[in-house]
Regions:
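Sec-dependent bacterial lipoprotein signal peptides
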Residues: 1-16
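Conserved, well-structured interaction surfaces
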Residues: 87-167, 200, 213-225, 380-387, ...
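Aromatic-residue-lined binding/catalytic grooves and analogous aromatic/hydrophobic interfacial grooves
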Residues: 18-19, 220, 235-275, 585-592
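Hydrophobic-face positions in mid-chain alpha helices that act as interaction patches
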Residues: 58, 256-393, 417, 423-474, ...
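Membrane-proximal, proline-rich intrinsically disordered regions
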Residues: 17-74, 322, 331-332, 509-593
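Alpha-helical solenoid repeat scaffolds, predominantly canonical TPR units
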Residues: 205, 212, 219, 258-261, ...
Length: 593
């Protein structure tokens, strides 16, 4: 079989270890007939799109600068204000109003996400077909074909996991999810033109993901990753993916099993491997912060993915941003874990407060871009954002959530306490500063019993009965509410800008709203709103796939469609190299006495 090797974001990342094989022109056909070629194709098989911005603007983390809102900083004069800012992309306006995002097909659009993830599926299927057909001959490289096949299955499972969570309703339970439209689960290369697909249902897609995931886990090792294991589904990343999958499926014992495979159970060891905030002391530019966050050698980072994404530009100085109430809920609020500061000190240390100099919103150094010039004279090229797709910090919170839902409250407290200690793992000098000025301390049981028991505090609810709308089996008992409030607060901070907040809102059944424009029009998403599943690309609908927002068709009732009819090659757009990010003055967040 043959495939054209895409020379995109993944190849950009791997340029330091590429050889003549990867330097082939994009349209040159290469036969996949050796272990080396299988492994090299897998190097570039990871999705080049990012779900970060698409999901952030669809969540409660983004507000409209042009709608009346109070300043982000509680220390500022509290008067309602609104601006007259333009959008970075017309699709942002559509998505913020929970409409189909159809005006753009370039990076950070639903169409680009759809096509890049199916392109990744396409490449994984080529590797699997070559191996399964027995067409791969030994070349003395020492690469293990079983490991290559396992990696391909993990890529395919991951791609469909993201696709179904973006373009379908959240998983509810085995029966209820049969009534929700899924996504095509593609298992053969495009060359098999006789194979056609429908969207099936969410339950079917989850079953197929689980099969690929379990088969991938059974065969994966780090044997084939000789230079850059964290750009692949290494063993730890595979277990982290499994923990996330089973959390979304609410198989909590398996969440803990796979989290333990990575984290272990020794608190001192886990703490030592969480994010190290000390290197931020020497950072000043967004690029400096990005290097620390995205550090390949960081023990906290389990898997890093290179993407075409302009996420920092979308949210910096334009209409839709982390501003006003969302900014307060995530960053700008007091807490018993820090006092005398109106902002989370971890945000001040870790570079979460990049802005334009006006209160138009904030972005974080963790999503700062790396620029690839295509025309230095014109100053244009492609923006790459490195995603920290799986981290120990997030995995620790996933384990804590599973422990809460199993009634293991002591274990959940220990994990959340450990997470908050990790949030404060500053250099000694920086820690002394914030401990004395902000009176920093980790989560305590008193905080759980007081602060997190009050629904008036950010990210806290009086009860979590809304989860039962998703499934009668999804019950958060009264004694677990304060733990889930704490988990929600910590997790919302941890996954900020990653896109995962949108998935959390969906899977928990949380109702939320967007306020739009100077007239303050309110758009609300209830737990079962069809718009909680983003609309698939117009071209896929025209080919015959069911729309996500269909209310008349049952899953699988539309005609079946060939892969090349609902997929097209994704094409990123070149942009200018300049951006206007600068770090805010943290002194403005000291609470005035």
């Amino acid at each position: 079989k043959y495939i054209a090797f895409a020379f995109g974001a993944s190849a950009f990342i791997f340029s330091g270890c590429s050889d003549s094989f990867l330097d082939k022109t994009p349209d040159e056909r290469v036969e996949i007939n050796t272990p080396t070629k299988c492994v090299q194709l897998l190097n570039t098989a990871y999705p080049e799109g990012s779900y970060g911005w698409v999901c952030e603007i669809s969540s409660d983390n983004i507000a409209d600068n042009n709608a009346p809102h109070y300043p982000s900083n509680p220390n500022a004069k509290q008067i309602l204000t609104h601006y007259n800012l333009g959008t970075y992309d017309r699709t942002d306006d559509e998505m913020y109003r929970f409409e189909p995002g159809v005006s753009s097909t370039s990076q950070d659009s639903p169409s680009f996400l759809w096509n890049t993830f199916y392109n990744s599926v396409h490449a994984a299927n080529y590797v699997l077909e070559a191996i399964n057909d027995g067409k791969v001959n030994s070349d003395g490289s020492g690469y293990d074909l079983k490991v290559a096949a396992a990696e391909a299955k993990l890529i395919r499972a991951y791609d469909h996991f993201i696709l179904v969570n973006v373009f379908s309703q959240a998983y509810k339970d085995p029966e209820a999810s049969k009534k929700d439209i899924g996504v095509p689960y593609v298992t053969v290369p495009e060359t098999n033109t006789g194979v056609k697909y429908d969207r099936g249902n969410v339950a079917e897609v989850y079953d197929k993901i689980q099969q690929d995931l379990e088969e991938g886990l059974a065969g994966i090792s780090d044997a084939n990753y000789r230079t850059a294991p964290k750009y692949h589904f290494n063993v730890n990343a595979a277990h982290a993916f499994a923990a996330r999958f089973y959390l979304f499926k609410r198989d909590y014992k398996k969440v803990i099993e796979h989290a333990n495979a990575v984290l272990g159970t020794d608190s001192a060891t886990i703490y030592s491997q969480l994010m190290d905030w000390a290197p931020f002391d020497s950072c000043s530019s967004s690029g400096d912060y990005a290097k620390v966050w995205q550090d390949f050698n960081s023990s906290n980072n389990l898997m890093i993915m290179g993407t075409y994404s302009n996420i920092m530009r979308h949210a910096l100085g334009y209409r839709f941003a982390l501003v006003g109430q969302p900014a307060r809920d995530v960053i700008f609020h007091s807490s018993p874990m820090w006092q005398s500061y109106a902002a989370n000190p971890s945000c001040l240390v870790g570079g979460y407060l990049f802005w334009t100099g006006e209160d138009y919103g904030y972005t974080a150094g963790k999503i700062a871009e790396r620029f690839q010039y295509t025309d230095r004279l014109a100053g244009t090229g492609f923006v790459h954002t490195m995603r920290r797709e799986f981290t120990r910090s997030e995995l620790l919170l996933e384990r804590a959530e599973a422990e809460i839902m199993l009634g293991q409250y002591d274990n959940a407290f220990q994990d959340m306490n450990l997470y908050t200690r990790g949030m404060q793992k500053f250099s000694p000098a920086t820690y002394r500063t914030y401990q004395s000025q902000a009176r920093m301390r980790p989560l305590s049981r008193d905080m759980l019993d007081s602060y997190y028991a009050l629904s008036s505090n950010p990210n806290c609810f009086a009860d979590w009965n809304f989860t039962q709308q998703m499934s009668s089996s999804f019950v958060v008992p009264a004694e677990a509410v304060k733990y889930m409030n704490c988990l929600n607060d910590l997790r919302r901070f941890e996954v900020l800008w990653d896109g995962l907040r949108f998935f959390d809102l969906k899977r928990w059944g949380i109702e939320y709203s967007h306020t739009y424009g100077p007239d303050a029009t309110v758009y609300t998403l209830k737990w079962n709103d069809p718009r909680r599943a983003l609309e698939i690309p117009a071209a896929a609908i025209q080919a015959g796939l069911q729309p996500s927002h269909s209310t008349t068709e049952t899953p699988g009732s539309a005609k079946k469609v060939a892969f090349d009819e609902f997929f097209s090659d994704p094409t990123p757009s070149a942009v200018s190299a300049s951006n206007n990010a600068k770090l805010d003055n943290s002194e403005s967040y000291v609470i005035k006495k």
